[in-house]
């Protein structure tokens, strides 16, 4: 599946069409108050573009939180409708459900050019296909799922997906539309453009930077990237498993992943066969407890980490080594911070690496930050707009980097 050959919103004739946009309005709420409207703001370019092309109406649909297939006011999209209305400077009609005769009647009766936001898709078990009852998974019937998908499809002539964060889920609103044209919105298109370039046609040298605690969780990721990259930096907690297995470094009480340890030699063998340079930290900031105010010191890998101490960040020599590796690269994909950046004492390694990739991006290289923790780092230090691309989807970007096909992307029409 090529990521760069999918139909775009710009390929569509939208005049007088009934347009359905699957957006990602899964915003953080404090009661009924939205604490960050970033996801709503991110969807505006696609919504505005569609409105400028005079559709019959625009129907927006999203999930919010995990209501587990039933109505729960806590997860209502009503506050989002208000926020969207003020951001768009245009009336937004909020409907109390996402399917059913009342929804169909309200949509049909809407004025030309209306913007309609449906209630949370996940109030219906048919969106995800199952729900948890007393810890057990209960599946929706095939007939009910088909009916739900048919009801959503019947609201539209054209389907646009702009929810990259959910693209790795084969949910009804992602793969259930029986419509001839299924296109990517601007947000999704940008994700596909950057990941497509890196994974299908990178400017070399291509560097992957990986963090995270467990090797076992990242096996598929490392294995797939070894087929594509020229070098790989391994930081974070999983570096200790590599150091212990490969160099017999004393790692004290640092994270050691037994299951992952068995795979390390295989991964290194593959790296060697493919000519991929694997860069590991050579010194550590260690702590006598996993806490923000622990005692700290710096040790080299030769000295090792004493019992009762654990590594929570890479040290100054590692930072220099990583900086030199970043400086050589023309394409960089970063997934996972190298240290416990949430604690100020152990954030320096992450901050130093961030400074280097910002520099690389400023020099015109392609730098992609996978969603999740690494995106949080970019946001924390206010550099999101100084990086070529910060992904909006943690799980979805990880699955792309693992070489998996995303159902929500595979479902889109191909460009003619």
From Swiss-Prot:
The modification Phosphothreonine is found at residues 93, 203, 241, 298, 331, 392. Mg(2+) binds at residues 213, 216-217, 373. It comes from the Eukaryota. ADP binds at residues 212, 236, 341. Its EC number is 2.7.2.3. Keywords: Acetylation, ATP-binding, Cytoplasm, Glycolysis, Isopeptide bond, Kinase, Magnesium, Metal-binding, Mitochondrion, Nucleotide-binding, Phosphoprotein, Transferase, Ubl conjugation. One of its GO terms (biological process) is glycolytic process. Pathway: Carbohydrate degradation; glycolysis; pyruvate from D-glyceraldehyde 3-phosphate: step 2/5. The modification N-acetylserine is found at residue 2. The modification Phosphoserine is found at residues 110, 130, 154, 172, 318. One of its GO terms (cellular component) is cytoplasm. CDD domains: Phosphoglycerate_kinase (cd00318). It catalyses: (2R)-3-phosphoglycerate + ATP = (2R)-3-phospho-glyceroyl phosphate + ADP. CDP binds at residues 212, 217, 236, 336, 341. AMP binds at residues 213-214, 218, 237, 311, 342. InterPro entries: Phosphoglycerate_kinase, Phosphoglycerate_kinase_CS, Phosphoglycerate_kinase_N, Phosphoglycerate_kinase_sf. It is found in: Cytoplasm; Mitochondrion. (2R)-3-phosphoglycerate binds at residues 23-26, 38-39, 62-63, 65-66, 121-122, 168-169, 371, 394-395. Belongs to the phosphoglycerate kinase family. Monomer. Catalyzes one of the two ATP producing reactions in the glycolytic pathway via the reversible conversion of 1,3-diphosphoglycerate to 3-phosphoglycerate. Both L- and D- forms of purine and pyrimidine nucleotides can be used as substrates, but the activity is much lower on pyrimidines. Negatively regulates the biosynthesis of acetyl-CoA from pyruvate in the mitochondrion. This is Phosphoglycerate kinase. It comes from Saccharomyces cerevisiae (strain ATCC 204508 / S288c). The gene is PGK1.
